[in-house]
Amino acid sequence: MKMNMMTETTFSHDSDLEEAVIGACMIERAAMPLVADKLRPEMFYEEKNLEIFVALQAMYRSAKSIDSITLKNELAARGKLDAVGGPYELLRISSKVSSSAHLEYHALILRQLHT
């Protein structure tokens, strides 16, 4: 078990799974509605993934279009772009995912890891 330093909670985690969820939300328009109310930022162990998910949720709730460019701009506006690894990190994460086919299952696993 590891500790998320931002939320000071201890839980098992899977960084690849976190990135799969975030990447799917960046590449497919229908992805964020599937996880927006099922996942909470504190369910992400990796700080960068937590910050990216916070930005994704805010964009979704504000009805903003989500893709790697708009997410980059949102993170920059929040002063978090460098903290998450910059635009190349966003591209790296999104390039690891080819579809959101297993997104709901991945979200379920993240929830289970957090409990």
PLM features: what roles do these ranges have?
Residues 1-113:
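Noncatalytic partner-interaction/assembly domains of nucleic-acid and motor enzyme complexes
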